Amino acid sequence: MDDNKRPLYLPFAGPAILESPLLNKGSAFSEEERIYFNLEGLIPWVIETIDEQAARAYAQFKNFTNDLDKHIYLRNIQDTNETLFYRLVRNNISEMMPIIYTPTVGLACERFSKNYRRNRGLFISYPNKDRIDDILNNSTRHKVKVIVVTDGERILGLGDQGIGGMGIPIGKLSLYTSCGGISPAYCLAVTLDVGTDNPQLLEDPMYMGWRHQRIGGDEYAEFVEEFMQAVSRRWPDALIQFEDFAQKNAMPLLERYKDQYCSFNDDIQGTAAVTVGSLLAACKAANSKLSEQRITFLGAGSAGCGIAEAIVATMVSEGISDQQARSQVFMVDRWGLLLDNMPNLLPFQQKLAQPCATIEAWDNYSDNISLLDVVNNAKPTVLIGVSGSPGLFTEEIIKAMHSHCKRPIVFPLSNPTSRVEATPKDILNWTSGQALVATGSPFEPVIVNGETFEIAQCNNSFIFPGIGLGVLSCGARRVSDEMLMASSRALAECSPLGKDGVGSLLPRLEDIQTVSKYIAFAVAKAAIDQGLALPCTDELLQQSIEANFWEPEYRRYKRTSF
């Protein structure tokens, strides 16, 4: 029987129900519920359906003139009535996703302490390092299945936001529910408050976090270890998603924990999975294979290198050698093209550095090979931006790329919109509409020579909700590289441009729940094939996915005692 059709038995009544976001129905409580739960007089006379409530909420939403106010309004609904919040977002997903997540969430993080209204999630501060178990036990969520955790050090392209980074886990989990159907009762946002190195926050009298320089080294590692062990004790089957950790910590934490816990890093692995999926779709639209591409990255941090490694793995799966695949990937950072003789390369960069011997014959060879030099010499067919610096994909660079590539694939992925390497409008105008474009933040359609181009948002929201739903539906013990590759291939199979030759590279946001279920099935199948989940028939797996997919509908309440 569908959970939404079963009554929920509650032992308490009155304001306690109205003040619980997971239980509150507002004006939708029935006459019987109002009597039995002592709600008469506490809410207006009229009994409404959830869609009537959503219509009023949407009208109020439209009265706000700026995106931050809209974000605050939606968060207030979420903190008052979660079922209504998710019904409203589901009904208006394209309009509201940019409000509850990127790009608006960046500004919300910057103003977190100034706009703080009500608690949500857990703040685990370093001075409380010996009481993490107690803090987890204080959570209002008792059956946690998905945790999104940040330390606030690298929030989007905005840098260190301290506890203001909590806006990111809250936003991510909103998408786990609205896109992936994971019940909000199973979701927990966590911020590890280890201080901040942002002087503006340290000097701000309204800042609500631990007012201290960030801890690092062994202290930091031990604190994170205590947190992971405590979570394992409290919720041993929970999926843990690392979010917006700084480069110096992101990859080491991923390597340390990916084989110990059911965990993944969305900035590295989620971004890689959605990018590979988008590239596979673009390659299909261009009648080519990923293994045939020459790919240049602007940005060689953990996210960029994570994408590059996923691309290499996918190329190898198409039949070329690892060495050949790496020879087709060029990483450029602030110091120029990564070369194997450069000092101070991080371990994850070393494997992607080009041998000097193969580059010495290039025109304009020097110790600092610019992005333009790489484009002119390597002649890439794919250009990916994860630099966090706006405007670096110049007209000269894009036109140079187009001169040797009829349909260049250009992905300026930096978030938020203010950090994008080039706008889709410019890229398409510079290439006479020939480029295949996907961006990290949402952009309006572009008209070039009378033709309208839908801009695909290469956003992790197309991937991580499906991964979460797949993990929960099959009971996977880990998140493997094979599961992530399966998610990429499943996403590519959903591409309108890849399937039909027209439309966007990625599906419409209105179809994201269907896409998430499709990805969940592929992810769960990969987990089962690897022995990371118990064997299951396709039919039972599909039934499990549907059973785990939560819908924003009110349940009937029954009183257990008076």
UniProtKB/Swiss-Prot annotation:
It is an enzyme of class 1 (oxidoreductase). SMART domains: malic, Malic_M. It comes from the Bacteria. NAD(+) binds at R154, D267, N415. Keywords: Metal-binding, NAD, Oxidoreductase. It catalyses: (S)-malate + NAD(+) = pyruvate + CO2 + NADH; oxaloacetate + H(+) = pyruvate + CO2. A divalent metal cation binds at E243, D244, D267. One of its GO terms (molecular function) is metal ion binding. InterPro entries: Aminoacid_DH-like_N_sf, Malic_enzyme_CS, Malic_N_dom, Malic_N_dom_sf, Malic_NAD-bd, Malic_OxRdtase, NAD(P)-bd_dom_sf, NAD_malic_enz_proteobac. Pfam families: malic (PF00390), Malic_M (PF03949). Divalent metal cations. Prefers magnesium or manganese. Its EC number is 1.1.1.38. The keyword Cell membrane does not apply. One of its GO terms (biological process) is malate metabolic process. HAMAP family: NAD_malic_enz. This is NAD-dependent malic enzyme.
